[in-house]
Amino acid sequence: MPLPGNVIQNSSIDAQTLINDAPLSRYQWLIAIICFLIVFVDGIDTAAMGFIAPALAQDWGVDRSQLGPVMSAALGGMIFGALLSGPAADRFGRKVVLILSMLVFGGFSLASAYAGNLDTLVILRFLTGIGLGAAMPNATTLFSEYCPDRIRSLLVTCMFCGYNLGMATGGFISGWMIPAYGWHSLFLLGGWAPLALTVLVIFVLPESYRFLIVRGGDTEKVRRILSHIAPERVQGVTHFHVPEETTQGASKNSLAMLFSVKYAKGTLLLWLTYFMGLVVIYLLTSWLPTLMRETGASMERAAFIGGLFQFGGVVSALFVGWAMDRFNPHRVIAGFYFVAGVFAFTVGQSLGNPTLLAVLILCAGIAINGAQSAMPALSARFYQTQCRATGVAWMSGIGRFGAVFGAWIGAVLLGNNWTFTDILNMLLIPATAAAAAVFLKSLVSHTDAP
């Protein structure tokens, strides 16, 4: 069936409208798979230290409270990496930042396997974290810019669940890898996997077409990219544009734009929400295997329970993304945060029943990881192209202070003889704060970018 003549004959076309009108192509699915794999290996490496900690403490003869700096080092690096990578990606491109970040976290993860003491490991995990912090938000940003508006939240949330799946996979496989091959093996896996994937990113993954358009890139390059998605629509087109290119311009400083009248309130509330959510997630991710060992669980069972918590985010991704595209996305996420706090509280009351404990940990993982996985999608749809990578990355970077705090406060509470039940009960506070912050954003700054 021929397309209307004015579509083919126009010399200029809105590239986002082209994406919105076309069915999802194999090319977009390929981009989704590559970005999924990027955040998957990011998740494995991010979670590695939490699963390694019990074996490392035993091997090196150190007390669990001494592991606090090691547990937090990668998170500190992730802050640094995220804050730098966002503006860099908005200036130089998403793809080049992705390549560099994967080389960094892959290389230093390999080096971590050969660390001989805690001080060396702290340095190597910090450097690994720089790459980890840069990779995840930029993969999210790049993929979101290839999604049609009608299902963007669903697709981005499903892609981002690769992060949770990676963290869960780290837990499941560490249960047999560490006893069989030693704690070094998980670092080796976390190093070689991203280095191998970098080859695919270099030769297959395209740059964001929106970035190329806004930065005044080569029209022919944009045409080649979009021809994989809607070949019949780009014939004869001499200029591609996107809404914000014509209405906002491309010369503004991306970081300054986050604090403009349009974005300032929403930016601060996104940061607060992400911060509080990561307090909950990283306290549990970093210390759940160790805490489970303290209750008498075997290393294999402790790793399995930790993996089960992360797997919950994979289970909820489809529903959360679907709901965000159909209802107020802020209130969907707020509901998941609050329910997560309730489940964390009930987990603390169920330590004597292993079966019920596993079910409740899965439910807590479904709620908190589902909410947190949806935040990059919410951020990506809030900011326009000129500051999208910066917005997503700075939410991730500032939020990582919550991750550092969560990992650190776990060591402090354990050192002060808090029980597992006490710690889990306390998590209701940051979970409720996250729910309140994102709900408030729905009232004061709800508008999506064009």
PLM regions: where:
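Conserved MFS/SLC helix-loop-helix module at the cytosolic interface between two early adjacent transmembrane helices
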Residues: F80-D119
